[in-house]
Each structure stands twice: as C-alpha cells, then as structure tokens.
Amino acid sequence: MDLRDLKTFLHLAESRHFGRSARAMHVSPSTLSRQIQRLEEDLGQPLFVRDNRTVTLTEAGEELRVFAQQTLLQYQQLRHTIDQQGPSLSGELHIFCSVTAAYSHLPPILDRFRAEHPSVEIKLTTGDAADAMEKVVTGEADLAIAGKPETLPGAVAFSMLENLAVVLIAPALPCPVRNQVSVEKPDWSTVPFIMADQGPVRRRIELWFRRNKISNPMIYATVGGHEAMVSMVALGCGVALLPEVVLENSPEPVRNRVMILERSDEKTPFELGVCAQKKRLHEPLIEAFWKILPNHK
C-alpha cells in the first residue's frame, strides 16, 4: 500500500466529504477517487458507502482506518528515529495556526527553536483557528496553536501561551450598524452579528448572547477565520466578538475602520496555547519543540 493513499483515505474517513478531502490533500476529486479505488482493489472490499449526500465507512473501512493510523504513526516514528542518528535533530515539523498567530505568537517560539535546532525544516500551514485542534487529532499537523476548548480531547496535550482578551467590535465609520450600537442601551436583538462558524470563539458569543438575554440574535453571517470577521465588521456588515489580538494584527486600513465596544468580562479565560497528540510527545522533534515553550515544566 502507498502511504499517500493511506493519508488520503484517513482524511476522507474523518471528513466524510470527497470534495473537502481533495482540496485538503491538494489532489483532484478524480485522483482521490482513484486512490480509494486502488485501496479497495488491494483489499477486495468496499471501504465507503456513497450516496449523493453522505459518505460512510464500511466495516472494512473502519478496520483500515485503525491500520492506517497505526501505520502512519509508526512511519513517522521511524523517520524521526533515523533522523536522530545524525549529529543533530533534523527532519520536518508540520505546524498549523491562524494567520494572526503566525504574526503574534509563533515567531518568538520559532526563533528559540531554530536557534537550538537549525537543521529542522518547519512546514507552516495557516487557516481557520477553529480547525487547529482537529488538524492535530487527525495527524495533518504535528503541532498547532489553538484556543483551548471547554472540553479538551483526551488524546491532546495543551501548553498555554497566553490568556487572551476578548472584545466586541463594531464599525467605526458612519453606517446603520454604528448608529444602532452608539445609543446608550442598544437593542442587541436587532443588531446584526458576524459569528465564527465553530470553535471557542463561537462558544464565547453564545455565552454573551445568554448573558445579555438575547434568545434570537440576528446573525448576518457565520465565518471561517477570525481575520475575515474583522474585515466584515470594517465593511459595516455587523458586530463581532473575537480575541483582541486578531484586531491588533489586522492591516492598519482595516483596523482603523473598527472600534471596540466592550471587553468581555467572562470569568473563564480565553486560553491560547500549543497542542499536540499526547502519544507523540516523546517523538524527538515534537519533544524538542515542547521543551522550548514558555510554560513547559
């Protein structure tokens, strides 16, 4: 079996969506289908049940998923072991984070890591912060910078970097939304909101609605990516609740079109940190990265 086919199969087994997996694995849908067909021919069994809307694993597919996870993990461990036979650490370390985190938190960490391990090649992928935890769980990333969810997956280790301030932002330039929020007591049930489509930030705005007794909020849009939320607020589409660091690292022309209405006073802090699979913390590259984190003990 080809390792690339196993990686593709594993992603599809998690996403249950051919188009999404094809984009994530940088292949065409037809290439992805051929890879799955190749595996099915090797095993002599169908791996998925497909219809127009859903993709589900067969019993053989479930068994192959376990095999693929174990095989790819063992291969990664073998690569790391071989890499360590040289005089210093080498190999590739795959990191996932948001564009904001790539500016705000990752550089000083990478500076320390590269000073100690200059032969390690960093492969950085940026995307929606809400996807960070899943990237680690599925093995698409070795490490990720992520907001800590209410319930941390049992298989994931989390090292905190910072407690982030969360702010409610609105358009600063004259527009109907600014007029709505500029009164002494805004009617929040009529104000359009820009929301994260998933993740800890989504949970924060839901708590904010509950605290302000807004049972039926007006949702203008749900967005993947906190940076896009700032842009939509700047355009006058609505208001949004998000980590202040996202606003601070937005381009100045966008930042200047936004104002802060309030800072969240939630008792539970918004924790940002680095996450990795617990079972992989002993791998030399991940272990070395983990040790240089500021709150490592």
From Swiss-Prot:
CDD domains for the chain: PBP2_IlvY
Function in brief: This protein activates the transcription of the ilvC gene in the presence of acetolactate or acetohydroxybutyrate. IlvY is also a negative regulator of its own expression.
UniProt-annotated location(s): Cytoplasm
UniProt xrefs under NCBIfam families: PRK11716.1
Keywords per UniProt: Activator, Amino-acid biosynthesis, Branched-chain amino acid biosynthesis, Cytoplasm, DNA-binding, Repressor, Transcription, Transcription regulation
Residue ranges: DNA binding: 18-37
One GO term (biological process): branched-chain amino acid biosynthetic process
Gene3D superfamilies: Periplasmic binding protein-like II, Winged helix-like DNA-binding domain superfamily/Winged helix DNA-binding domain
Superkingdom: Bacteria
Gene Ontology MF: a single term: transcription cis-regulatory region binding
GO CC term (a single one): cytoplasm
Coiled coil: none
Family assignment from sequence similarity: Belongs to the LysR transcriptional regulatory family.
PROSITE patterns cross-referenced by the UniProt entry: HTH_LYSR
Protein known as: HTH-type transcriptional regulator IlvY
Native species: Escherichia coli (strain K12)
